[in-house]
Amino acid sequence: MKALVKENAEPGLWLADVPEPTIGSGDVLIKVLRTGICGTDLHIRAWDGWAQQAIRTPLVVGHEFVGEVVDTGRDVTDIKAGDRVSGEGHLVCGKCRNCLAGRRHLCRATVGLGVGRDGAFAEYVALPASNVWVHRVPVDLDVAAIFDPFGNAVHTALSFPLVGEDVLITGAGPIGLMAAAVARHAGARNVVITDVSEERLELARKVGATLALNVSDATIADGQRELGLREGFDIGLEMSGRPEAMRDMIANMTHGGRIAMLGLPAEEFPVDWARVVTSMITVKGIYGREMFETWYAMSVLLEGGLDLAPVITGRYSHRDFEAAFADAASGRGGKVILDWTA
């Protein structure tokens, strides 16, 4: 089968022929229809410092996908050939305290699809049945392909109650954009999102942000004044991983404010912990999705009319992956989709 492979320990990806995956008794074989390009895939392609430490070549990359089940292991009873599915990209041990308690997203032995094992940028992918989400109601294929990052957005945005709250989101990348859409849909009063890309800020306006603020020429305090906020933001969603974004967020929270932090910093940085303590701010780290509560919430949000169409800005055949990756790496748009049927 054709697959996008990190063949060598150097920058680049290769469209190559590799063997089709085999399945065990509890696994599912899936024909891939479409995939989404993630920031993780960009790091692997660029072969940056993180990738050099985390990746062992050769590796089929990719973890965001939608496909159709073509075969199941003998012990799989609730998934059948023909089902339209997406997959949870974090594979867990099933044996640790957190897994046994049902907190699978907290497993210390998590292995990432397309990072620690062959992934989904291929004509076929195999997963344990426990990692397969069946779309029981129709979902647009492009949206179904990005259920993984959509789950990151939902997990982060719904970490705290949002109804009537003023929400600050730092970082208007694809996950930040989806979080803005979720926050508005879930009843937030104001949703302010910051970035330095006007193209992405325009996408934020399309998904319903109350105010899309370019912090290269305005401050979050300016945004507060424009909206008439006098006490700061109730909820903060940090999506950028930028030190200055986290510091600005803390400085603009109300007393008792709550911050969910998904953005992954590249290195340690100082934080005004005195402000966190004296303002009684809660900071919660987010990694991945809650399995499968977040997936259920995603489906319900879409059934309820949540529109993610503006977030998807690029569509390419998998054969045009070089152009697709360049688009995704530009930092100007939203999610980029690879079509494995074209």
From Swiss-Prot:
Q: Tell me the Gene3D superfamilies matching this sequence.
A: Medium-chain alcohol dehydrogenases, catalytic domain (3.90.180.10), NAD(P)-binding Rossmann-like Domain (3.40.50.720)
| Cofactor(s) this protein requires | Zn(2+)
Cofactor binding notes: Binds 2 Zn(2+) ions per subunit.
The record lists NAD(+) as bound by I175, D195, R200, L262, G263, L264, I286, Y287
Q: Where are the transmembrane segments?
A: none
Active site (UniProt): T40, H43
Identify the SUPFAM superfamilies for this entry.
Answer: GroES-like, NAD(P)-binding Rossmann-fold domains
Q: Which domain of life is it from?
A: Bacteria
Residues that, per the record, bind Zn(2+) 1? C38, H63, E64
Quaternary structure note: Homotetramer.
Which protein, by its recorded name, is this? L-threonine 3-dehydrogenase
Q: What is the lineage of its organism?
A: Bacteria, Bacillati, Actinomycetota, Actinomycetes, Kitasatosporales
